[in-house]
Regions:
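N-terminal prepro-regions of secreted/extracellular proteins
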Residues: 1-41
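Mature secreted bioactive peptide module from preproproteins
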Residues: 34-121
Length: 121
């Protein structure tokens, strides 16, 4: 069965090996911090080519928030998140756990995403 979320290790590996143009926001990544695994890590990107998510990507590490995510076409996260078709985390939203089109490396195809709900971990 396909896991709906990526593990911390899988997310770190993707970050270390991707050639995507990355913008990093939120808390600094500190693998030695005891609470670091409690943060939610979300990577959301502008492009999908076949089963690969990439292009311009943003990586978020932190707690509960609403992320402004215009032009998002795919995403991955270490906890279940919501993705919405309007800014401000409203209108029509879906959960990563119910991803309809899975992509490589734990990503989900999420065309039309404009914001992402990061719940408390």
């Amino acid at each position: 069965m396909w896991p709906q979320t990526s593990s911390h290790a899988e997310m770190m590996h993707w970050l270390a090996t991707t050639d995507a143009a990355l913008t990093i926001i939120g808390d600094p990544i500190n693998p030695l911090a005891p609470r670091s695994a409690q943060n939610t890590m979300v990577t959301y990107c502008s492009s999908r080519t076949q089963n690969v998510c990439g292009g311009a990507c943003t990586f978020y590490n932190g707690g509960a928030t609403c992320l402004n995510a215009p032009n998002t076409n795919c995403l991955a996260a270490t906890h279940n998140v919501g993705f919405c078709d309007r800014a401000g985390c409203g209108h029509s939203c879906n959960q990563l756990s119910t991803c309809g089109t899975r992509l490589d490396n734990g990503f989900c195809f999420t065309p039309g995403t404009r914001s992402i709900i990061v719940p408390p971990a």
